[in-house]
Amino acid sequence: LAGPGGAGKTRLSIEVGLQVVEHWPDGVWFVDLAPLSEGEVVPMAIAGAVGAPSVPGNDAISDVVAHLAAHSALLVLANCEHLVEPISRLVGVLRERCSRLGVLATSRVPLGLIGEKLYRLDPLGADGVESDAVRLFMERSGLDGDVDLSDVVGLCRAIDGLPLAIELAATRSH
């Protein structure tokens, strides 16, 4: 999933994981990579999240591959944009060696993998009072129909229809 920050990629990836978990016998693992600043720690973060045992003499990539190769599961990697190159390399290895593993990655930019299926998540439309952005604002704000919806449309346009920004603005509207 690729799209601008605040478009809802992480939230959507969590929802996808919840919806498809029954199709993956060994479940779904979620790894948020946002806190990482170095590409070298990506395999260790994934190993910790999936419970890959550390084998003496192995590096973290080998531990992750050995563990995930034995599972039919979905690995969700969120917030990959700041470490695209190391994540792409690791996902490439996982795709080669872990035939029963699915990978769903979220990023502001595509990972650039051969065979990557790219789904773009764009901001919500804010083109009128019936738009998705206005509906989200009204739903999250709890305001009733007495609000001047043209102001809400203007606000939603000003924040580019980004769901996260709309939700934050809605919570401050009281």
Question: What annotation goes with each model-predicted range?
Answer:
Residues L1-H174:
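Aliphatic-rich helical/repeat scaffold segments used for oligomerization and domain docking
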